[in-house]
Each structure stands twice: as structure tokens, then as C-alpha cells.
């Protein structure tokens, strides 16, 4: 399957992420389940979590964590 490219991310309350993809879809992803994994433990700091950015189609944080854009697309809920 060819996935649309992630273009924008906005952190929301309760570790949710608002996502915008290149096909115009707006989706929401609940990041909370990932926070139990050691790799994402630092992101329990909500201020750090809110500093999420998009780099070349995937989300990342300055502390080195990133997340697969295909998983974001498949596991998120469409809003439009």
C-alpha cells in the first residue's frame, strides 16, 4: 500500500496527536499506549511531548524519539 506523506502534526491534550497527510486527510492518533515503552519514556513529560515536529514525513522529538508514519496513518482515526 502506498501511504500519503505526513505533512503536519499538532500535539493535543492527553497525549493525542492531530495529523495532516498529503492526501488532505486529517487524523487523530492516541500516543498514550506507546509511553510505556522504554524508548518513549521521556515523552511522559508533557512539555517535551508537545515539542513534536515533522521531519521528512515522520514525527520526531529533539530527544531522539521518532515514530513510523505508516503506523500513524493505519492506527489513527480519520476526522474529515
What are the roles of these predicted feature ranges?
Residues 1-80:
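Motif-centric detector for short Cys/His coordination patterns
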Amino acid at each position: 500500500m502506498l501511504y500519503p506523506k505526513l505533512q503536519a502534526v499538532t500535539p493535543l491534550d492527553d497525549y493525542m496527536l492531530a495529523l495532516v497527510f498529503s492526501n488532505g486527510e486529517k487524523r487523530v492518533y492516541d500516543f498514550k499506549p506507546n509511553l510505556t515503552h522504554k524508548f518513549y519514556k521521556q515523552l511522559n513529560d508533557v512539555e517535551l511531548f508537545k515539542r513534536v515536529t515533522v521531519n521528512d514525513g515522520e514525527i520526531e522529538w529533539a530527544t531522539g524519539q521518532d515514530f513510523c508514519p505508516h503506523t500513524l496513518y493505519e492506527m489513527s482515526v480519520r476526522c474529515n
